[in-house]
Amino acid sequence: MSKVTVNIQYCGAWGYGKYAKALSSSIASYFGDGVVDVTFEKDSGATGNFEVTMNGTLIHSKTKDGKGRCESDKEKAGVMEQIEAYLESL
């Protein structure tokens, strides 16, 4: 059973799905199977969103914080660090 649920909300009109899938793969590779459950929420229309929540808490936001689509190692590391910190607190 997963200890963490991460939801990736992404813009459906600008092809952000590939970035959401890439982040999901990175999370699975980093934490292994069954630790993090990743879900996807595709926006209908052009929203520009790439929002990542962990158990309902926003941890990465392209729209609100001006961050990107988790393409860079730095942005991916930021997401991983927050998930890891949560897991260590359990």
Language-model-detected regions and their locations in the chain:
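Hydrophobic beta-strand residues in large extracellular and virion-surface proteins
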Residues: 6-8, 38, 79, 83
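Short, thiol/selenol-centered motifs that function as redox-active sites or metal-ligating centers
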Residues: 1-31, 46-49, 69, 73, ...
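Thiol-based oxidoreductase modules, predominantly thioredoxin-like and allied folds used
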Residues: 33-46
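Short strand-turn-strand beta-turns centered on an Asx-Gly dipeptide
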Residues: 55-57
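Non-catalytic, surface beta->alpha helical segment in thiol-disulfide oxidoreductase systems
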Residues: 59-90
